[in-house]
Amino acid sequence: MIKGVGVDIIEINRVKNAIDRNYKFIEKLFSRREIAYIKAEKTKAQYIAGRFSAKEAVSKALGTGFRGFSFKNIEIHKDDLGKPIVVLNGGARAIAEGYGKYQVQLSISHDREKAIAYAVLEVF
C-alpha cells in the first residue's frame, strides 16, 4: 500500500552557488559514502542537486518533512546499474518503521537547469 509520495524540484544554479560559497555545506547534508559518490561525479552541481531534491522528496513521502531527523538520516546510494537506493537511518528510519515493513521507491532526473526527484513510500 502507498503510504506517502513526495516530489521536489530545485534549480541547479542555486546548488552551484552554494558550492562556490561554501563547499563544507556538503558535509552537513551528506554521509561519507554519499560524499564519495559526489567526488567521483564530473557534473557535481547536477548530481548534488538531484540528491538534495531526492532527500527532500523522501522527507515529504514520510509525511513529516525534516521533523525529528536530519538530512544525513536519508542516504541516497545506487545499485550496480545506477538506480537510486534509499537508506533510512535514525529518526527517518523510526518514522518509516512505525508504519510497519516499508520500501522507498525513488526516481531522480535533471537537465541543465533543474533537478527533480519523486519518492513513494510503500508499506506492507
Swiss-Prot record:
UniProt entry keywords in alphabetical sequence: Cytoplasm, Fatty acid biosynthesis, Fatty acid metabolism, Lipid biosynthesis, Lipid metabolism, Magnesium, Metal-binding, Transferase
Gene3D superfamilies reported for this sequence: 4'-phosphopantetheinyl transferase domain
Entry-linked NCBIfam families: acpS, pantethn_trn
Name of the gene encoding the protein in the UniProt record: acpS
Compartments (UniProt record): Cytoplasm
Keyword Metal-binding assigned: yes
Protein name: Holo-[acyl-carrier-protein] synthase
Organism of derivation: Clostridium acetobutylicum (strain ATCC 824 / DSM 792 / JCM 1419 / IAM 19013 / LMG 5710 / NBRC 13948 / NRRL B-527 / VKM B-1787 / 2291 / W)
Homology family: Belongs to the P-Pant transferase superfamily. AcpS family.
